Amino acid sequence: MLNDRAQRLLKTLVERYIADGQPVGSRTLTQLSGLDISPASVRNVMAELEDMGLVASPHTSAGRVPTARGYRVFVDKLLTMHPLEQQALRQVESGIHPDSPLRMAAAASQLLSDLTHFAGVVITPQRADAAFRQIEFLRLSEKRILLILVTPLGDVQNHLLVTDRDYTPGELIETANYLNHHYAGQSLEHITRDLEQELASLQGHIARLMTAAIHASKEATSQDDIVVSGEKRLLSVEELSSDLASLRRLFDMFEHKTELLHLLNISRQAQGVSLFIGEESGLSPLDGCTVVTAPYTFDGTRVGTLGVVGPTRMNYERVIPIVDITARLVSSALSSPLSGSDAPSSH
């Protein structure tokens, strides 16, 4: 446990280092902390904090800098949160409005990057347990059918079905009507379980087409995707750009996305804002970074995650409320009756 004096000095050191990026010396800490304490006493406290792994001494400086563990203590116990400034709040409110979910994800990602000057990341709202609002079939040619799936979020998804026989327009309409009447609004997992029991009693052409449609829909909605914006802004962050090998690994991760998707899916289960500082992410490309995330919801169900990837030396006091408010506004916009109303027609 840190005593009050050690906490005050650690808080002062982290805030100063975030502000200017320079190692903080004992004399500066004495002046800024407001404590009635000598530089020698400050040095003793700094030595204790260093032994605890909360601060470190760069070889080229007599001052100290916070470690990832030091940032964690700062964020969990010492951070003073303030309301987001009005200009940034207005920018978030004007940038997030009811739209197709995919366009909204792209807008949120860009907005997060613009406001923080780091990389904005958003998982698009596609879930394996997703439902559909409406299904249509369109005959393209013999044995080739276009499945048009409208999700509850308003996205229109097109999937090509290659069938074992030709279907008449009447058969396609009959199958679509059956699915829409019996299963609209139900999860694909629930539909799959029901179909296993019902297929035997259905006409063969309906059963085969329904099976193909649900399989294609599940395959598509189980594939989460991630939108990354502004990653090139990290090139101007000295702590990251000074190590080219680490920077290359970071950009490889942005390009291939699998590891980042896994991390964001973990944070989807959290309540409110989550932070992964340095090695806490378990991903070596992020060892010098902090990832700040928050889940967003549709009708009370968490359907995606958004956040910011930046250096560990970031203005947590500002970034955390930006991520939190953006997630809340995306959730609100997704639940708006206007959401998805201008999704492009598939016909």
Curated annotation (Swiss-Prot):
Q: Which domain of life is it from?
A: Bacteria
Gene (name only): hrcA
Q: Name one GO molecular function term.
A: DNA binding
As for what it does, the entry says:
Negative regulator of class I heat shock genes (grpE-dnaK-dnaJ and groELS operons). Prevents heat-shock induction of these operons.
Is RNA-binding given among the entry's keywords? no
Instruction: Please name the taxonomic classification of the source.
Output: Bacteria, Pseudomonadati, Pseudomonadota, Betaproteobacteria, Neisseriales
Q: Name the source organism.
A: Laribacter hongkongensis (strain HLHK9)
**Which GO BP terms, alphabetically?**
negative regulation of DNA-templated transcription
User: Which Pfam families does the entry mention?
Assistant: HrcA (PF01628), HrcA_DNA-bdg (PF03444)
**Listed name of the protein:** Heat-inducible transcription repressor HrcA
Keywords (alphabetical) are: Repressor, Stress response, Transcription, Transcription regulation
Instruction: State the InterPro entries in the record.
Output: GAF-like_dom_sf (IPR029016), HrcA (IPR002571), HrcA_C (IPR021153), WH-like_DNA-bd_sf (IPR036388), WH_DNA-bd_sf (IPR036390), WHTH_HrcA_DNA-bd (IPR005104), WHTH_transcript_rep_HrcA_IDD (IPR023120)
Protein family per UniProt = Belongs to the HrcA family.
NCBIfam families linked to this entry: hrcA
